[in-house]
Structure formats: structure tokens, C-alpha cells
Amino acid sequence: MTTALGIDIGGTGIKGARVDLTTGELVSERIKYPTPEGGHPGDVLDAVEALLSDLGGKAADHTGICFPAIVTHGITRSAANVSADWIDFPAAATFAQSLERDIHFVNDADAAGVAEAQFGAAQGVSGLVIMLTLGTGIGSAFLIDGTLVPNTEIGHLEIDGSSAERRASNAAREREGLDFEAWGLRLTRYLSHVERIFSPDLFILGGGISKQHDEFFPFLEIATPIKPAALLNNAGIVGAAYLAGNALLD
């Protein structure tokens, strides 16, 4: 069995596990730490180091880390719901040096999309699949015939005078006390806008709230088919591990 470690850094939590790269299944306990207040790189690095120790990770393990930012060549180019210190930060090199292992850094929604393409709801789907992760913000991944187009960031599209994630993320639902019907109307407004621009063949909705898709899918009224993420909130972990295992084996 070939495995790799996947770490998913979010605005509120950092979680990780060992992943079977053939099946996409977690083959260890999933461990979660709270994201340190302020989300500064050094503090997050310390939390990741502790998490890897809990997982029994070794320097030889392929290790992927997904993060809520545009990531190019291992450098985080933006910062969503974390410290601005991440902007233009050499994340992969810094983490690799401190953790004494090769690190593959990737955008969190892109990792989730790759996981769904390899093992989940987008497996074998042709055409354009748009995956949206509904959490602290709205992440996005575009997959064309299963191939990732990275760093799309369409959660920042403007809807009704505000960014989509300010109005339609799961955090917005919780912050404003919206019931699922009211939230579904906001999601429909956003999804309809995305649909008009990109004409996707399938939407996949992920993030922790996807476990409750039966509660809000009935209120989503768009023409494009919609599926919940098959890997639920583990998709980032699985995708990060898969990308690390394949990138570092090349």
C-alpha cells in the first residue's frame, strides 16, 4: 500500500491523516488542531509539526499541505481568513526546511477538487466540473475532463455589491442566523451567476456543511446538476496527499 500524509489548514482548524493513494481512504485517525489565533505562519507551522508528530509521520513520508490561498510554485500569494503575513510567503520551502521533509503546497479547494476527480463525485465526469467548498469562505476548483485548472478563486466574485463568500458562505449563514431556505436562495443567486459565466456540466458542493446537503439542496434552483462532495470534509486531506504522492514521485 502506497500512502502519503495530507494536511488541511483552514481558517478555524488544521486537520490531517495518512491516506491510501490507491483508494483515497484515510488509513489513520484524522487528527484536528485549532488554527492558532491570528493564523501567523510560524504559529501554524508549530501546529502542523505537532499534528505530524501525532500521526507518526517520518521524513520519508510524502506530505501535502492545502491552504486557503492562491499557491504558485510553493509560494502563497494571498491570505483568506488568516494572517496577511502569508502573502508572497515561501510556504513550501519554509515548511520543508523546518519539518525536514519535502512538502507539496496547494490551494485547499484545488486539493478537494482533485480528490473528488480521482475518488469521488467527479470521477469519470467529462466536461467542466466546478467544485465549491462552503466554509469560512467559498473555495473553488475547476476540472476539465478531470484535469485541474488551479487558483480560480471565484468565491470572490461580486454578488449584489459584496463578494460571494461574504453573502453565501457557510460562515455567512451562521453569522446571520439564516435558515437553510434563506441560505439556499443566496446560494442560488451565486450559482446562477457562475452558471451564466462558465456553463459547467456539474457543480460539486463540499465543505463540512455538505454532510447536511439534504437540508439545503432542495432550495437550489439552477439548470446545472449538483452533487454533494463524496469525500465530504476529508477532500482537502485526500487531495493534498494525492498531489504530494504524485508530484514528489515524478
Model-assigned labels for residue ranges:
Residues 76-88:
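A charged helix-plus-loop insertion that forms the helical arch/lid used to bind
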Residues 1-62, 71-75, 95-100, 115-130, ...:
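ATP-binding/phosphotransfer module of carbohydrate and carboxylate kinases, centering on a glycine-rich
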